[in-house]
Amino acid sequence: MATPWRRALLMILASQVVTLVKCLEDDDVPEEWLLLHVVQGQIGAGNYSYLRLNHEGKIILRMQSLRGDADLYVSDSTPHPSFDDYELQSVTCGQDVVSIPAHFQRPVGIGIYGHPSHHESDFEMRVYYDRTVDQYPFGEAAYFTDPTGASQQQAYAPEEAAQEEESVLWTILISILKLVLEILF
């Protein structure tokens, strides 16, 4: 007789834990961020969905892959960014976050790519306006110069470019291997 009550109590506790976790996920957004939009969608493997952002200022895109793996590509020079034509990207498994600087030309193109490792991907993207004001929007080095000229910083990190190229190559290689395996079997 106590077993059904224990099961019911465990179910109630489990639902409370799930609710608490969901609340904590939503609360980890800084107070300075203002939620503008919530976009939900579904994307097929190897396909793109495109969105356009017209809001001015610093914008934060937080996309969660609910099922599968959706990747995020952003550009202010093309309305259809892709994995080989973008300015900003986030290609993680799970939550993707991209911070769009205020100086990006509007409209900003947003490409959501369904990774080929999953037949379909469901995603939810939250668009936030960041109300914080950068004291030095181009970095402190842009405003204060060393009179001796001894400290020159490189604006471009070659390690990052090599890592991005490597990521694209791995994606292409995996896609080719899947295609070969699909043909053989």
Curated annotation (Swiss-Prot):
It comes from Mus musculus (Mouse). This is UPF0669 protein C6orf120 homolog. It holds the Pfam family UPF0669. It is found in: Secreted. Keywords: Apoptosis, Glycoprotein, Secreted, Signal. May be involved in induction of apoptosis in CD4(+) T-cells, but not CD8(+) T-cells or hepatocytes. GO terms for cellular component: extracellular region. Residues 1-23 form the signal peptide. One of its GO terms (biological process) is apoptotic process.
